C-alpha cells in the first residue's frame, strides 16, 4: 500500500517513481541521499500495515544510483542482533564484494544509531565490533578512500519539467542479493562455535530481537 506516501505528497505508484525526481533534484547540489530503515525486514512488520521496507530501500537506492548520487543510510530502530546487522550489510553491498574490480553499487556512508550501555554489554558489543569489521570487508581503515575536500558550488537550476521527467517510466530496482556474503555470525555452533544467524531473504521470516545501536559515522563500505 502507498497510502501513507500519497497522503504525504509522494505519488509513488505502480507506474510512477516519486523518489527519483528527488534524487535528480539533489544532483544539482552534489548532495548525498541519506535514507533510513536499512536494518528492517518485511517479515518484521505487522501484516496489517502492508509495509515493505526492503522493497522501499531497493527503490530509493536504485533511484539515487541511477541519478549518479552517493547513497548513505542509517538504522531506524536501535538494534544489536546479527539479523539486523546482516540486513544492513546486504543493503550496504547489494551485489556482494567484487574481488576483480571496484564494487559498482555500494553505500557511501552509514550512521549507526545509537550509543547506549546495552550496546557495550557482552555479546552485543562483540556483535557490533564484528559488524564494523564486515562493513570494511574485513580490511583496515584507509583514510585516503574518502579524503576531506571543499564543498562544490551548486550547479545551474534544473527546470521542474526535467526533474519530473525522472518519475516515469518507473524502472525496476536494481536486484539485491538475498543475503550478505560477509555475515555477522550467531554463537551456538558445535563446541561453542559460530553458526549463521536465521535470516531469510527479502520477505523472509525472522525472529525480531530486543535491540539498540550507536550514534556515529562509519567510513564508506568497501
Curated annotation (Swiss-Prot):
Pfam families for this protein? Glyco_hydro_14 (PF01373)
Keywords per UniProt: Carbohydrate metabolism, Glycosidase, Hydrolase, Polysaccharide degradation
- Primary enzyme class: hydrolase
- GO biological process terms, semicolon-separated: polysaccharide catabolic process
Q: Please list the reactions this protein catalyses.
A: Hydrolysis of (1->4)-alpha-D-glucosidic linkages in polysaccharides so as to remove successive maltose units from the non-reducing ends of the chains
Please give the Gene Ontology molecular function terms for this protein: beta-amylase activity
The record's listing under Gene3D superfamilies reads:
Glycosidases
Q: Where would you find the membrane-spanning parts of this chain?
A: none
Annotated active site residues, numbered on this chain, are 74
Q: What is its EC number?
A: 3.2.1.2
UniProt-annotated binding residues for substrate: 36, 75-76, 114
Instruction: Give the family this protein belongs to, as stated in its UniProt record.
Output: Belongs to the glycosyl hydrolase 14 family.
Q: What is this protein called?
A: Beta-amylase
Per the UniProt record, the lineage of the source organism begins with: Eukaryota, Viridiplantae, Streptophyta, Embryophyta, Tracheophyta
Amino acid at each position: 500500500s502507498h497510502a501513507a506516501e500519497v497522503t504525504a505528497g509522494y505519488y509513488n505508484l505502480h507506474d510512477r517513481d516519486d523518489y527519483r525526481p528527488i534524487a535528480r533534484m539533489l544532483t544539482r547540489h552534489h548532495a548525498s541521499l541519506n535514507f533510513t530503515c536499512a536494518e528492517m525486514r518485511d517479515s518484521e512488520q505487522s501484516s496489517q500495515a502492508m509495509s515493505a521496507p526492503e522493497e522501499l530501500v531497493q527503490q530509493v537506492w536504485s533511484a539515487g544510483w541511477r541519478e549518479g548520487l552517493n547513497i548513505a543510510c542509517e538504522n531506524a530502530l536501535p538494534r544489536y542482533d546479527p539479523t539486523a546487522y546482516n540486513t544492513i550489510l546486504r543493503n550496504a553491498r547489494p551485489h556482494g564484494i567484487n574481488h576483480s574490480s571496484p564494487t559498482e553499487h555500494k553505500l557511501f556512508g552509514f550512521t549507526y544509531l545509537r550509543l547506549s550501555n546495552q550496546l557495550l554489554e557482552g555479546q552485543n558489543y562483540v556483535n557490533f565490533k564484528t559488524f564494523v569489521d564486515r562493513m570494511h570487508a574485513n580490511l583496515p581503515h584507509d583514510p585516503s578512500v574518502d579524503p576531506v575536500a571543499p564543498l562544490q558550488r551548486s550547479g545551474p537550476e534544473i527546470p521542474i519539467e526535467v526533474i519530473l521527467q525522472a518519475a516515469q517510466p518507473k524502472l525496476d530496482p536494481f536486484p539485491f542479493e538475498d543475503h550478505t556474503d560477509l555475515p555477522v555470525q550467531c554463537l551456538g555452533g558445535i563446541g561453542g562455535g559460530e553458526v549463521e544467524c536465521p535470516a531469510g531473504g527479502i520477505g523472509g521470516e525472522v525472529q525480531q530481537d530486543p535491540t539498540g545501536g550507536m550514534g556515529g559515522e562509519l567510513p564508506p563500505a568497501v
